[in-house]
Design a protein with these regions (language model features):
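Extended, composition-driven regions rather than compact fold-specific motifs
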Residues: 1-236
Length: 236
């Protein structure tokens, strides 16, 4: 095969041209096809949606796994941190974006527009999302943050109705209480740690007096990252 021949040539002589020939032989042609498709406006979202549908078929059609690998490898490149844009989400954000926040919330269900308002409108509540320039109307992942005077004992303290906003001068804690991935077609591509680290930097710059950053939302391996950066991990 072309791959075997290119490997043999490279093993005999590790020249750049032989390495390039091996890469070209090993690269599935369909990846070039997907790259060309992605040049069409709006195609990125359609390809992400296609992988979402593909993932639902893998259990009964394992032979499609090679196609999933190709799409995942392309998405890892296309959606790397350098391309992502952090945007704050608040009560004045466009309605279609707010509707998606309601729909995509995966940790603590948003039961109504009033429930969403309680999470976004008060001055001691923040929400941040990553977007991609090719999908500007589709959040990739978002995190909800409560700014508190003391460590809350549970998420119910944060979401309770009728509470009074924390006075600005008393805020010492930033509590990350919910983080939600939005695009099923990007499953297996990690955004959570990058989002948290970026938001920590954003809030630290915005509010230098913030002393503690904690999480009440399960983020894989997040506790280890918190420990490395001397940030407190709160109770579940």
């Amino acid at each position: 095969t072309a791959i075997s021949s290119s490997i043999e040539r490279y093993q005999r002589s590790k020249e750049t041209t032989n390495y390039r020939a091996f890469i070209d032989a090993a690269q599935p042609r369909r990846r070039d096809f997907f790259r060309r498709l992605n040049e069409v406006p709006g195609a990125t979202f359609e390809l992400v949606s296609m992988r979402r549908d593909l993932l639902s078929l893998l259990a009964e059609n394992p032979e499609l796994g090679v196609l999933d690998i190709d799409l995942r490898e392309l998405f890892i490149s296309w959606f790397n941190r350098g391309f992502l844009v952090l945007r704050p989400i608040d009560w004045t954000s466009p309605a279609h974006i707010l509707e998606k926040i309601i729909s995509y919330e995966a940790v603590h269900e948003i039961s109504s527009w009033e429930d969403l308002r309680r999470r976004l409108a008060p001055p001691d509540r923040r929400c941040f999302a990553f977007f991609h320039p090719s999908m500007p109307e589709e959040p990739l992942i978002f995190v909800e943050v409560a700014l508190c005077a003391e460590l809350p004992s549970s998420v119910q303290d944060i979401l309770s109705d009728g509470r009074e906003p924390t006075p600005e001068k008393e805020i010492e804690y930033a509590v990350f209480y919910s983080i939600s991935n939005c695009q099923q077609g990007l499953a297996g591509i990690s955004f959570g740690h990058s989002l948290i680290k970026t938001v920590v930097a954003e809030l630290s710059q915005e509010r230098p007096k913030l002393k503690h950053f904690i999480t009440l939302s399960p983020v894989p391996n997040f506790a280890r990252w918190l420990a490395r950066h001397n940030i407190q991990d709160g109770p579940d």
